[in-house]
Structures are given as C-alpha cells and as structure tokens.
C-alpha cells in the first residue's frame, strides 16, 4: 500500500511519519507460566497536527492456527478471539535540548553518542540520523509506562524509564520494544520483566498496513 506524508503533519514528527496508519497482523506471545499462543494485533497511529502521534493498540488471542510469521497472510482474514490486552498513548519526538535515552546519552550541542553496549558511533556516518523519542502509554490493566529511546531510519528501539501501577495491577517492572519497517510490514518485538521474572522475550509479530 502506497504511503504519503500528510501535508499537515508537524515537521517534528517526520522521523515517525512511516508509522502513520492502521496496521493489523499476527504474532506470538509466551512467558513463564504463559504457554505460547498466537495472537492478532491491530495498531493505529494518527495525528492532529501537533508535534506527536496518537497511538492505540489492541491484542486478541487468534481464533485459529498460525504457522509462522514468515508466511504470507491476509490481515482481514485473521479472526480475533478473546481480548488479551489494550493500550493507548502518545509518541513524541524530542527536538532540541539535552537528549536522554535508555540506550545512551548525547550531550547538548554534540553529535557524539554512546551506543548500546558501549560502541561508538560509526565514524563514516553510514547509519541513519537518530532522533530521540518519548512514549507515554496507559493500559486498562492498571499500568502507565514511560518509554524512551530512539528512531533511526525505519527502526525504533524503546525501553521503559518508568512503570507505574495501581495497587490491584500485576507486577510489571520493565520492558523494551523494537519496531522496524521491513518490506512494507511493521515488525515488532517486546521483552518484559514481570511477575518476578528477569527481562526476557514476551511477544513479537508482523503487521500489514491497512490504511
């Protein structure tokens, strides 16, 4: 599906413009005490002209079998079963000022970045420019999370800076997320530290652009 940047999109949001639209596709989730199961995810990014994107995502258990994420699929044909999770919030690129990221630090007025694992930036500049992004998410399960990270070309890496929960919500202490645009599809993966377990893979999937 052809995508064009809206004329009224705020320039600050251009690094995230490729997320705009409605996405739907299959995935898998598994965690200690949660057997692996297929899911269907529907995600939408919208804008109102402000320097941010509005976001909403819903996950259902898939009513049917899923052979794998590398097979062709019809997003409309994926049958949603029991509701599993929902979340909504805002994605905001950080423009100007000191940059802070869960994956490294850039001092104000400097292009020197400490990369994940302590690696220095590519001196030849082969990597795409990086923009810091802040994400605020709320879930009806009783959790509110603040993610920080960066968008570099068609890839986004995020990690929680804060996870708050109500007194009745399950224990979730941290999470990381990766999003990438691959051959027109939105690939995603989530690692989670929850219920007393260390950070580990929780879910992943592949979404096709619907609109």
From Swiss-Prot:
Q: Which Pfam families match?
A: THAP4_heme-bd (PF08768)
Q: Where is this region: Disordered?
A: 104-130
> SUPFAM superfamilies from the xrefs?
Lipocalins
Name the source's superkingdom: Bacteria
**Motif GXWXGXG, residue range(s) on this chain:** 21-27
Regarding protein family, the annotation reads: Belongs to the nitrobindin family.
PANTHER family attached to this UniProt entry? PEROXYNITRITE ISOMERASE THAP4, THAP4 PROTEIN
This protein's name: Ferric nitrobindin-like protein
State the organism named in the record: Beutenbergia cavernae (strain ATCC BAA-8 / DSM 12333 / CCUG 43141 / JCM 11478 / NBRC 16432 / NCIMB 13614 / HKI 0122)
């Amino acid at each position: 599906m052809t995508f064009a940047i809206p004329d009224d999109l705020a320039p600050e949001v251009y690094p995230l413009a490729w997320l705009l639209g409605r996405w739907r596709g299959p995935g898998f989730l598994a965690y200690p005490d949660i057997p692996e199961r297929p899911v269907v995810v529907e995600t939408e990014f919208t804008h109102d002209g402000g320097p941010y994107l509005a976001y909403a995502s819903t996950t259902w258990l898939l009513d049917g079998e899923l052979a794998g994420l590398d097979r062709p699929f019809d997003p409309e044909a994926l049958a949603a079963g029991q509701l599993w999770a929902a979340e909504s919030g805002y994605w905001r690129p950080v423009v100007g000022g000191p940059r802070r990221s869960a994956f490294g630090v850039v001092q104000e007025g400097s292009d020197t970045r400490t990369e994940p694992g302590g690696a220095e930036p590519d001196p030849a500049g082969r990597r795409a420019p990086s923009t810091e992004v802040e994400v605020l998410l709320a879930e009806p399960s009783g959790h509110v999370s603040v993610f920080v990270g960066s968008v570099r070309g068609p890839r986004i890496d995020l990690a929680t800076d804060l996870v708050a929960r109500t007194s009745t919500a399950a224990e979730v202490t941290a999470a990381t997320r990766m999003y990438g645009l691959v051959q027109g599809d939105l690939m995603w993966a989530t690692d989670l530290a929850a219920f007393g377990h260390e950070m580990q893979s929780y879910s992943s999937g592949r979404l096709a652009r619907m609109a």
